[in-house]
Amino acid sequence: MKTFFKDMAERAIKTFAQAMIGALGAGATGLIGVDWLQALSIAGFATVVSILTSLASGIPGDNTASLVNNKKEGE
């Protein structure tokens, strides 16, 4: 279960960063022109979606937040 939450946190942090970068570059030409509240709102929503996706993808007993089985055959 510990691995699941580590995976989920890693995905959520990456998603937040990616969404923030996308929101910042979408319409602003400089730091002053950025609508920071909107950018944080977009990144926050993307993070919530990431967490919900991880929870929905978690297979009991798999201990990861991935829907795909990453174990090699024979493990």
Curated annotation (Swiss-Prot):
The chain crosses the membrane at residues 16-36, 39-59. Coiled coil: none annotated. Pfam families: Phage_r1t_holin. One of its GO terms (biological process) is killing of cells of another organism. The keyword Cytoplasm does not apply. Signal peptide: none annotated. It is a multi-pass membrane protein. This is Holin. The lineage of its organism: Viruses, Duplodnaviria, Heunggongvirae, Uroviricota, Caudoviricetes.
